[in-house]
Amino acid sequence: MSKDDLIQFTGTVLELLPNATFRVKLENDHVIIAHTSGRMRKNRIRILLGDKVTVEMTPYDLTKGRVIHRH
């Protein structure tokens, strides 16, 4: 799968879960589970409750995603 196949959404962090995982409510009112991308872990970017984030998702599983940017 190429990078062009990924879908990006904006959402808000609802809940902090273990292992850098978050429950995120997307702008279309879907709630998904998202984990932090490797670059964000490497640079130690903290994500807190209520933060606006950009989530990247694959079209094959629309219940999971990856947080790629914090606004």
UniProtKB/Swiss-Prot annotation:
CDD domains: S1_IF1 (cd04451)
One GO MF term: translation initiation factor activity
Protein origin, superkingdom: Bacteria
Transmembrane parts of this sequence: none
Gene Ontology CC terms, in alphabetical order: cytosol
Keywords of this entry: Cytoplasm, Initiation factor, Protein biosynthesis, RNA-binding, rRNA-binding
Cell compartments where the protein resides: Cytoplasm
Domain S1-like residues, every copy: 1-71
NCBIfam families tied to this protein: infA
PANTHER family: TRANSLATION INITIATION FACTOR IF-1, CHLOROPLASTIC
Subunit structure: Component of the 30S ribosomal translation pre-initiation complex which assembles on the 30S ribosome in the order IF-2 and IF-3, IF-1 and N-formylmethionyl-tRNA(fMet); mRNA recruitment can occur at any time during PIC assembly.
Protein family membership: Belongs to the IF-1 family.
Its job: One of the essential components for the initiation of protein synthesis. Stabilizes the binding of IF-2 and IF-3 on the 30S subunit to which N-formylmethionyl-tRNA(fMet) subsequently binds. Helps modulate mRNA selection, yielding the 30S pre-initiation complex (PIC). Upon addition of the 50S ribosomal subunit IF-1, IF-2 and IF-3 are released leaving the mature 70S translation initiation complex.
Protein name: Translation initiation factor IF-1
Organism: Rickettsia typhi (strain ATCC VR-144 / Wilmington)
Higher taxonomy: Bacteria, Pseudomonadati, Pseudomonadota, Alphaproteobacteria, Rickettsiales
